[in-house]
Amino acid sequence: GDVYKRQVYWSQSGNTQAMAEAVGAGITAAGKEAAVVDVSSVSTAELKNAKAFALGCPAMGAEVLEEGEMEPFVTEVEGFAAGKTIGLFGSYGWGDGQWMRDWVDRMSSAGANVLNGEGVICKEAPDDEAVAACTDLGRQLAAV
């Protein structure tokens, strides 16, 4: 099986990175090894053989994924997402989470099993509730 459960994220202000670290903490707490990596330092090839992984990205612009690095990465993942269990998470500063609903729809349409059928989102920096939700997401990933 997988040695590492990977969380790949893009973060501008550090909020989504904090969420990624909480997901990683949940994986570690469940007795598995976590790899929390910035999207700029990972290739989609590293996820192809994984049964489960998490992706994190904040809402950008008009409720879209970050277009320079994360969007192309997610587009590649769509090509092999069928049958994978994927956790999604990210922070937002405005709006109501439409970017995440769109992202969940994309991954589901590609055949992925999105954990809990929705992403973990929080406004601005993750509060205790958001950290707990991310940690729980990590525990779920570790069990796959």
Regions found by a protein language model. Give the residues of each.
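Short, small-residue-biased leader/transition segments that mark boundaries at the very start
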Residues: 1-4
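FMN-binding flavodoxin-like domain, especially the glycine-rich phosphate-binding loop
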Residues: 15-18, 22-39, 45, 49-144
